Amino acid sequence: MMNVESLERVEKSRFGSHFTKPLYGDYCFSNIPETIKKLLGAESSRSLPESILKGLPQKYDKIVLFYIDAFGWKSMEQHQETHPLLRRFEKEGMISKITSQFPSTTAPHVVSIHSGCPVGESGIYEWYMYDPKLDSIISPLLFNFAGSEERNTLQNAGFQPGDLFPHRSLYKELKTENITSFVYQSRDY
C-alpha cells in the first residue's frame, strides 16, 4: 500500500520548482534510526509517524534495514512496477515517501543512519569538508586528508574518530536496551 499521507506531507514541503524542505519533525530520513529503536521496543526520542506502518504491527522482534545509497523516490517510482521486491513491498507492506536531509549527499546520510544524529548534530555535511582543527580539507567517511589514496591518514596524524564523528551510535543504544544488532557492509567502509 502507498502511504498517501506521506505523499501529501512531502508535496506540501516543496518550494520553488526544484526544492523540498526536509521534514525533520516527521517524514525525514534522519528519523529512521529512532524509528528502528521504537519498533524494537527501545526508548526513542523522535521517529517517523505511525502512518509509515499503518495497518501493520507497531512492534517487531527483528528488523532488517537495507541502506541503498542514491536510491531515492524517483528510482523507486521508476522500478516499482518491474522489480519483484518493490511490488511485494507495496502489496504486503507500506511504502512511504520521506524527505532527505540537507545537504542530500552520501556522507551526512551514512553518518546519520549509523549514529542516529541528524546532519545538524553530526557535523558531517559533505564528502569533503574543511576541518579547522586540522586546518585541512578532509574526507570524513574515508577518514583521510582530501586527495590521499591511503585510508586513515587522519588517524596517522593523531586525529581519532571521536574527534570527528558523533559519539552516539544506534548500535550502542540498542545494546543498552539488550537488543542485539549487526551491520553487514564491505570492510572497505
Briefly describe each language-model feature range.
Residues D61-W73, I113:
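Beta-strand elements within well-structured catalytic alpha/beta cores of enzymes
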Residues L48-P49, D69, I95-S96:
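Short secondary-structure boundary micro-motifs
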Residues K59-K62, I179:
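Short coil/turn segments at beta-strand junctions that form active-site/ligand-binding loops
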Residues L48-Y60:
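A short acidic-Thr-Gly-centered motif at the start of a beta-strand
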Residues M1-S45, H79-I95, T99-Y189:
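His/Asp/Glu-rich, glycine-adjacent segments
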Residues S51, F71, S122-Y125:
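Short, low-complexity intrinsically disordered segments
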Residues Q58-K59, W73-S75, T82-H83:
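ATP/Mg2+-dependent ligation/transfer catalytic cores
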